[in-house]
């Protein structure tokens, strides 16, 4: 599930790699949902399902996702606690949550501070909501790549 799918860049990339699977493209903005629908039709895609989410929930069935990704989305959440609790219900038993966020610790990352997040802050918030850090990738030049699992 790609929460905050936007134009579907990651949703459709994942779809190509998982032709027998299902990819949920979750978006709250109607304009982006329209873009997703047009793109899905243009690509004749059959395994991306477009979902209208809300500020508090991705509106997905329980235990329906092996992985949830949020790319440059977490810092934008209006209700992070509620969203994380909803994501916990969506993830399958061994499911994972992937967050990619701009590095708040690095002043060289030329992004407005309100669009950056530190690992310490993410770990604190995720831990308080029943997640633990599973893997931290250091291969992206200006972003964190953090994979969490349910406690």
Question: Which residues does each PLM region occupy?
Answer:
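A short beta-strand submotif of the Rossmann-like class I SAM-dependent methyltransferase core
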Residues: 67-71, 83
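Helix-to-beta-strand junctions that scaffold the AdoMet/dcAdoMet cofactor pocket
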Residues: 18-19, 77-78, 91-93
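Core SAM-dependent methyltransferase catalytic element
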Residues: 129, 134-151
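Glycine-rich phosphate-binding loops of nucleotide-dependent enzymes
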Residues: 4, 65, 135
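A short acidic, Gly/Pro-enriched loop at the edge of an enzyme's catalytic core
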Residues: 58-68
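A short glycine-rich, Lys/Arg-flanked "PGG" loop and its adjoining helix->strand segment in the class I
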Residues: 81-96
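Conserved class I S-adenosyl-L-methionine
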Residues: 98-123
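Class I SAM-dependent methyltransferase SAM/SAH-binding core
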Residues: 1-58
């Amino acid at each position: 599930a790609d929460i905050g799918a936007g134009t579907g860049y990651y949703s459709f990339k994942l779809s190509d790699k998982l032709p027998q699977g299902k990819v949920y493209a979750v978006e709250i903005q109607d304009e982006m949902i329209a873009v997703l629908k047009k793109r899905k039709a243009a690509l004749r895609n059959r395994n991306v399902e477009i979902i209208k989410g809300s500020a508090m929930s991705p509106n997905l069935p329980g235990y329906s996702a092996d992985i949830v990704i949020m790319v440059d989305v977490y810092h934008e959440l209006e209700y992070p606690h509620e969203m994380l609790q909803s994501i916990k219900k969506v993830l399958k038993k061994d499911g994972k949550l992937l967050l990619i966020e701009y590095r708040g610790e690095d002043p060289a990352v030329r992004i407005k501070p309100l669009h950056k997040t530190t690992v310490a802050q993410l770990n604190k918030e995720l831990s308080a909501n029943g997640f633990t850090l599973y893997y931290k990738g250091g291969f992206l030049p200006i972003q964190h790549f953090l994979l969490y699992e349910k406690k």
